[in-house]
């Protein structure tokens, strides 16, 4: 009998503990589309779990030992710890326990792969690469960390050779993914609760790009000093650089913004050619940078300039990445996932480029530990906002840390020179702030990884109701 060398087709049911999570659900969906028997549990039903049920998954609400009675394999994320009823029951039965990234890696072994890593921009970049490959008729399989508007999902099964995945560095498992093409957007000190220190994180990214095969390529943004330093350490593998700087292989030039659209040309310095007249229907230098990485991959795979330009111009974006949720009385409401100071600064700069009015930022800090460790950075990242509202910290299970609360951040912003920062004590107060501070032409940007998204999505109806 020959031992299996890849994921057997008859394995299962495969049970996902926390199947509704954005990272878990995409893998579950692709497994379903490949004909595997998939089930899972989550604490409450959501749009994501309902979609998985429609695709054939069995979904349990709540996590109990009896949920895994029929399971043969258990998939967990780093959020699932000993003491979880299903994990403990699975271990008692001797079932295989598979980390999320390990299962993603098994799927990747079926294809050639493009893996997108970086502290910020992974989800948008993954979507851009998938969009271009789709337009180039590569028909890629995709597993993303956000809902792609064009798909209505964070995953799709393609029939082509290529698979595009978001490589999450948060728990250190991303450098086990078998990437053929590895993209690195940027490297900042984040997820230190896992990595311990910045040098270890740097080594993690070096391991990630060093794992590509000799026929692969690393695609790296050398506008970022840490990534440029990483490029200097990559040996015996091909590297394509991108960015705005004059040394980048794939470089954006002649960038301008009009009506929230980025217009630019792309200098392909190794080819000695320029792709003129590119446009991207979302503002922000960071988004143009992300697009450059996708263009680099597309050209590496032989895509023509006109196909690339057409696909970029029609880019539909990703949920919660500068997502326009409504416009009331000339005031635009934006929902964005940004919760790190670098992300917040980039989003607010994009808002400045997208509106001629004022920018009102409302932020819900995510985790006391992040706010505490990056406190000075948070105090300096809102300069492009005319008005800043700070909501209570979304704890994500953490205990409060002295000096790292909502009012501390408001005081810190004022101390660092912000002219108009205040606390927002709830949805009613958010509505009050917007009514008091906005006028036609302004933009309200709600930022954070917690419940602030629900506030943003509910705000247009609240404002409309009050105006009626």
Swiss-Prot record:
Localization per record: Cytoplasm
Enzyme Commission number(s) from the entry: 6.3.2.8
Cell wall biogenesis/degradation recorded as keyword: yes
Molecular function GO terms recorded: ATP binding; UDP-N-acetylmuramate-L-alanine ligase activity
Chain positions recorded as ATP binding sites: 118-124
Record's keyword annotation contains Repeat: no
GO CC annotation terms, alphabetical: cytoplasm
Top-level taxonomic group: Bacteria
Catalysed transformations (reactions): UDP-N-acetyl-alpha-D-muramate + L-alanine + ATP = UDP-N-acetyl-alpha-D-muramoyl-L-alanine + ADP + phosphate + H(+)
Broad enzyme group: ligase
GO terms classed as biological process: cell division; cell wall organization; peptidoglycan biosynthetic process; regulation of cell shape
Major localization listed first in the record, in broad terms: cytoplasm
Record's keyword terms, sorted: ATP-binding, Cell cycle, Cell division, Cell shape, Cell wall biogenesis/degradation, Cytoplasm, Ligase, Nucleotide-binding, Peptidoglycan synthesis
Gene3D superfamilies, alphabetized: Mur ligase, C-terminal domain, Mur-like, catalytic domain, NAD(P)-binding Rossmann-like Domain
InterPro entries the record matches: Mur-like_cat_sf (IPR036565), Mur_ligase_C (IPR004101), Mur_ligase_C_dom_sf (IPR036615), Mur_ligase_cen (IPR013221), Mur_ligase_N (IPR000713), MurCDEF_pg_biosynth (IPR050061), UDP-N-AcMur_Ala_ligase_MurC (IPR005758)
Pfam annotation, one family: Mur_ligase_M
PANTHER family: UDP-N-ACETYLMURAMATE--L-ALANINE LIGASE (PTHR43445:SF3), UDP-N-ACETYLMURAMATE--L-ALANINE LIGASE-RELATED (PTHR43445)
Reported function: Cell wall formation.
Family: Belongs to the MurCDEF family.
Protein name per Swiss-Prot or TrEMBL: UDP-N-acetylmuramate--L-alanine ligase
Lineage, opening ranks: Bacteria, Pseudomonadati, Pseudomonadota, Alphaproteobacteria, Rhodobacterales
């Amino acid at each position: 009998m020959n031992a299996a060398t890849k994921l057997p087709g008859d394995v299962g049911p495969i049970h996902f503990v926390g199947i509704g999570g954005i990272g878990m659900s995409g893998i579950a969906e692709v497994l379903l589309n490949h004909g595997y028997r998939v089930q899972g549990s989550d604490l409450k039903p959501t749009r994501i779990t309902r979609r998985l049920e429609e695709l054939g998954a069995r979904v349990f609400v709540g996590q109990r030992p009896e949920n895994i009675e029929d399971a043969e394999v258990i998939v967990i994320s780093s959020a699932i710890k000993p003491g979880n009823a299903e994990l403990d029951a699975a271990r008692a039965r001797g079932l295989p326990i598979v980390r999320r990234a390990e299962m993603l890696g098994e799927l990747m072994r079926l294809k050639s792969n493009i893996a997108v890593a970086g502290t910020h921009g992974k989800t948008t970049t993954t979507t851009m690469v998938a969009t271009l490959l789709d337009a180039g008729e590569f028909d890629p399989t995709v597993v993303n960390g956000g809902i792609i508007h064009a798909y209505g999902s964070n995953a799709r099964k393609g029939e082509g050779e290529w698979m595009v995945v978001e490589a999450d560095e948060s728990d250190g498992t991303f450098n086990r993914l078998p990437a053929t093409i590895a993209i690195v957007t940027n490297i900042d000190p984040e997820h230190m609760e896992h990595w311990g220190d910045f040098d270890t994180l740097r080594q993690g990214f070096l391991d990630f790009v060093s794992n590509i095969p000799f026929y692969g390529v690393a695609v790296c943004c050398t506008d970022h000093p840490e990534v440029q330093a990483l490029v200097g350490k990559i040996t015996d593998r091909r590297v394509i650089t991108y960015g705005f700087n004059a040394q980048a292989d794939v470089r954006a030039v002649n960038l301008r913004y009009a009506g929230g659209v980025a217009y630019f040309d792309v200098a392909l310095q190794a080819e000695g050619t320029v792709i003129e007249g590119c446009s991207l229907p979302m503002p922000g230098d960071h988004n143009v940078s992300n697009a450059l990485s996708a263009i680099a991959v597309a050209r590496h795979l032989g895509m023509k300039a006109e196909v690339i330009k057409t696909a970029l111009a029609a880019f539909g974006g990703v949920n919660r990445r500068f997502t326009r949720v409504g416009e009331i009385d000339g005031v635009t409401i934006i929902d964005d996932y940004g919760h790190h100071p670098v992300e917040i600064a980039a989003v607010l700069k994009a808002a400045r480029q997208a509106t001629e009015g004022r920018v009102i930022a409302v932020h819900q800090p995510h985790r006391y530990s992040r706010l505490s460790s990056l406190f000075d950075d948070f105090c300096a990242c809102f300069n492009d906002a005319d008005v800043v509202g700070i909501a209570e910290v979304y704890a994500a299970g953490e205990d409060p840390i002295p000096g790292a609360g909502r009012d501390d951040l408001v005081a810190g912003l004022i101390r660092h020179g912000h002219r108009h920062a205040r606390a927002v004590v709830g949805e009613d107060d958010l509505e009050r702030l917007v009514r008091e501070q906005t006028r036609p032409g302004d933009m309200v940007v709600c930022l954070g990884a917690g419940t602030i998204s629900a506030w943003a999505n509910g705000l247009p109806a609240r404002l409309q109701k009050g105006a009626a």
